[in-house]
Amino acid sequence: MPTEIIAICVICAVIGAFLTYLVVNALVAPYKRKTKNSPRPSSNEAKDEEYTKILLEMVSCKTVYDKENTYKAEYERFYKVIEDNFPSLTKKAIRHDFDGCFLYEIKGNSDLNLLLMSHHDVVAEEGEWETPAFEPTIKDGAIYARGTIDTKTPLFAELKAVDELLASGYEFPVNVFIASSNNEEIAGDGMPKVHAYFVERGLRFDLVLDEGGAIVQKMMPGVKEKSAMVAVHEKGRHYYTCTAKKRERGHLGLNPVKDNAVERLSAFISEVKSSNIFKKQFTPEVEGLFRTHAPYMPFVLRLVMSNFTIFKGLLLSILGKVSPVVEAMLATSVYFKDIKGDANECSTTAFFRCLREEDLMLEIEKIKKIAKKYDVELVQTERDYCIPSSHKTTQFARLEGVMNELFPDVIVSPFLLTAGTDARHLGDVADCILRFAPIDLDTKQYASIHNVNEHIYIWNLAECVEFYKKIITTYERK
């Protein structure tokens, strides 16, 4: 047989084997599904009524934080609502106060510490609401009010779960803490004060569970199942002041000069935005997002996602163009917030959101070279970065197990949160930080976050309470 024919046969065999490998991976993927068609545990009408009453009281309090303390009376009313509606917690837990940011502590039977978190401040009621934002209304089986999603329902569920366990005489397997900030929405000092207290006491947490992710619909193209999005990391925040100063002096009319600080700063901003500085990459949590959803996708998409390693380069080049949300998960982003000054001296604040801090530092060096070209000075003014957790941990597996038991119809997936949470302050005192609450949101609910007509369905309240109970009690199985 001629050598050429042998070579062609070998090439065809290799191509055939490769294609077979791709197809087999796609065909096998559905067998890796963890969701089940079995129904969720049924709700209890009496519990729904009790839980609704408490949450109505909580969301009626206008806990909008500002430096003038405009709503101090509303905050005080909110704390009284908690004291009255969670009697076992009030009686048996240790309560710490940090100028409005509160912390409950319940002693357990081991040295392990578990921290549950949800802030209690809310954003103002801007826009045209169908019902008053702070006069809770029940409509079509849902409670409409500011804070129902972000994040008084999760806070209610955490408090109620612990309150009911305490009332039953349950002996906690670990030390349980519940922390709630009064000024998270403005990136305030509430949780940093609690963090300082943890450091002072030498406390370290096996798990910190904050808000951030939820149960959502249509997370991936072609995926019909709902997804429980558990953030194991959030993008870091770095602020830099970029300043340009006029190098030559002269009267604009009598002795004009070409140098102009505004023009140089504008040229600097333009080049930073147009340059390909920020490296695109799949971090483990973003890769985990795609791999987890692959078994649930239609065949063509499943063919690609089930062979993620092979198609990674192609996906990097395409995905960022498809969705701004996905693009934000793949690289550092920069936002120039303002320009202040005049032709003699002007400045801008550059806001960087990074995936990994070490990558940002390399990218900043590239930006400094551009800054030098335009004689712009860069000064870092703020750094806020939390070490990533992993979705391949005991803590994540425990949460996934709870979700599989209580929400068998839902995919549990890691992801990268592009927003921010209070949990970012606790990276040095936690073994694992997860950002998730079991609030089940349809597309309208998701769109109502920080928007008009925010609402939560009453049937979801008992599920949330049971979730936090299970998170606590499953530590017995460790």
What are these regions (language model features)?
Residues 1-12:
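Feature marks short, highly hydrophobic, charge-poor N-terminal signal-anchor/signal peptide-like helices
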Residues 15-148, 168-172:
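Acidic/His- and Gly-rich active-site-bordering loop/insert found
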Residues 95-96, 108, 216-218, 278-344, ...:
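An extended, acidic, His-containing surface patch that forms the Zn2+-binding/catalytic region
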Residues 121, 272-277, 368-376:
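A common structural junction motif
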Residues 131, 173, 204, 224-225, ...:
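Short, solvent-exposed loop/turn segments at the edges of secondary structure
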Residues 143, 149-229:
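Acidic/histidine-rich catalytic neighborhood of metal-dependent amide-processing enzymes
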Residues 192-197, 252-277:
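A short core secondary-structure module
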Residues 251-256, 357-363:
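Short, conserved charged micro-motifs
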